[in-house]
Amino acid sequence: MKIAIDAMGGDHAPKEIVIGAQKAIEHFQDIEITLVGNETLIRPYITNDERLSIIHTEQVIEATDEPVRAVRRKKEASMVLMANEVSEGRAHACISAGNTGALMAAGLFIVGRIDGIDRPALAPTLPTIDGKGFVLLDVGANVDARPEHILQYALMGAAYAEKVRGIHRPRIGLLNVGTEDQKGNELAKKTFQLIQDTSLNFVGNVEARDLLEGVADVVVTDGFTGNVALKTIEGTAIAVFSMLKSALTSNVVSKMAALALKPQLMQLKKKMDYAEYGGAALFGLRAPVIKAHGSSDAHAIFHAVRQAREMVVNDVIQTVKQSIAEIKQ
């Protein structure tokens, strides 16, 4: 199995990307990795090139580039060449921590959509109090959606949760303003009915305040609402940890308490760390495409590789195809 990685994408590229890739190769004996980027910058961080190859290019899609234009005009950009490796059959999956919009464009225009999927969805796995996490989609691949699009999100999310996360009959929830069946706008009401009419393990409407309680294994919504929910969760987590740090360093007594609680605090931090869950999968494409967080370190890249590998090994794409075909019948 070969995985292509954009070595130049992200805040800490190429160093953390290369280190994370090597860590994955050492851990998983059945993978090969192709790093795409400036070989002069990549090579100093390689300590073992076994099952590791480089495609050299000096062109990069920047965070400030307009996504679609960049993908179409920068034909030699590391992200574009990475996507080409997948579309031309030389790699089974790809990963980038670079420009999110550009990666979605590359996935759509180069890797291509699965037949029957109207719109891809961006789906991160977020932490929950019990440590199991949940998949949220869409978080911004498409800000608008129709009920049938969100139904497809539910099918794709269920396939991923079952095949990759090992959850038998994952619970599917629809993000809404209340838990009652008839709550929400027309989009929510029509989507509710569509999902309810399938064989999915649909638990109904779920509220944003209950997401981190683990109320569902997969939560679906339109991209606008999902992105707002994601950013709210991220911002709240940052604020809480900041307030906690301030309170525990305010005086000598609190500093002593912090020292005593250090193991528990580190455990909490690890439980809430996005890196433990890999990246956000771009569902609906013909091959696994993973968007790693822009600030990903080597640890996060390792888990993104693990995630991509599991999607390939468990044939998630084929499961999605079958699910969509059954709904279309």
Swiss-Prot record:
InterPro entries according to UniProt: FA_synthesis, Phospholipid_synth_PlsX-like
Residues in the signal sequence: none
Protein's pathway: Lipid metabolism; phospholipid metabolism
Record's subcellular location: Cytoplasm
Question: Would the keyword Transferase turn up in this protein's UniProt record?
Answer: yes
* Family annotation (SUPFAM superfamilies): Isocitrate/Isopropylmalate dehydrogenase-like (SSF53659)
Does the keyword tRNA-binding belong to this entry?
Answer: no
One of the record's GO molecular function terms: phosphate:acyl-[acyl carrier protein] acyltransferase activity
**EC numbers:** 2.3.1.274
Q: Which reaction does it catalyse?
A: a fatty acyl-[ACP] + phosphate = an acyl phosphate + holo-[ACP]
Write out the similarity annotation: Belongs to the PlsX family.
Q: What does this protein do?
A: Catalyzes the reversible formation of acyl-phosphate (acyl-PO(4)) from acyl-[acyl-carrier-protein] (acyl-ACP). This enzyme utilizes acyl-ACP as fatty acyl donor, but not acyl-CoA.
Q: What is this protein called?
A: Phosphate acyltransferase
Which species does this protein come from?
Answer: Anoxybacillus flavithermus (strain DSM 21510 / WK1)
Taxonomy of origin reads:
Bacteria, Bacillati, Bacillota, Bacilli, Bacillales
